[in-house]
A protein has these predicted regions:
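Residue-level detector of short, conserved catalytic/binding motifs and their immediate flanks
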Residues: 4, 36, 46, 112, ...
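Secondary-structure transition/turn motif
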Residues: 1-2, 50-53, 167-170
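Surface-exposed interaction regions enriched in Ser/Thr/Asp/Glu
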Residues: 1-19
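Terminal beta-strand-rich extracellular "head" domains
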Residues: 133-147
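Exposed extracellular interaction/assembly regions and N-terminal maturation sites
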Residues: 64-135, 150-170
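Residue-level "contact hotspot" at macromolecular interaction interfaces
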Residues: 1-2, 107, 145
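Tight coil/turn sites that cap or link beta-strands
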Residues: 2-3, 149-151
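Beta-strand-rich receptor-binding modules of extracellular spikes/adhesins
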Residues: 19-67
Length: 170
């Protein structure tokens, strides 16, 4: 077919039946110029190279990122109860259009960090009631900045049952 591409993966040795191959010490080249690859080291480590440089290194001890990693900031929908997802919106912001309740973030993973910026609208002086799933220092939820168009930033760590506050900027 016109414009069709043919991909060839060359693996030494016989290939038959299910594709179960030992790639120990092998490098799988993922692009035409050979600078993007997966390499299965012999020391329980997998290197992912992009542009000829290590991008990520996975090992039994840890995962190493050679470049910055981030979650794009999601904009939450303002509503009487503000909903958000720890799995798809771990970094979020919302602009308050009235006094609101912040619902518990859905689908969290134990040990996960999440962050939210709560912004006052042009009127200001909006309040937020936090769901009981959020736990603050001294067991007291903070009072938000009342200034119009200003915001407060909160960071939480999920412990399996509660979102424990680990930082704030008011």
């Amino acid at each position: 077919a016109s414009g069709a591409s043919i991909f060839i993966v060359e693996i030494s040795g016989a290939v038959g039946g299910p594709m179960n191959r030992d790639l120990n010490g092998e490098e799988l080249i993922l692009d035409v110029d050979g600078d993007t690859s997966l390499h299965a080291d012999t020391d329980d480590q997998i290197d992912f190279k992009l542009g000829g440089s290590d991008l990520m290194v996975f090992s039994t001890a840890n995962t190493k990122f050679e470049r910055g990693a981030f979650n794009p900031e999601a904009t939450l929908t303002d509503a009487s109860t503000i909903s958000w997802s720890a799995s798809t919106q771990p970094v979020a912001k919302v602009t308050l259009g009235g006094n609101r309740t912040l619902g518990a973030a859905a689908n969290p993973q134990t040990g996960q960090f999440i962050a939210i910026t709560i912004i006052q609208d042009g009127t200001g002086s909006r309040t937020v009631t936090f769901n009981a799933a959020y736990e603050f220092v001294g067991d007291t939820a903070p009072t938000l900045t009342a200034t119009a168009n200003k915001g407060d930033h909160f960071v939480f760590r999920y412990n399996g049952s509660k979102f424990i506050e680990v930082g704030r900027s008011l």
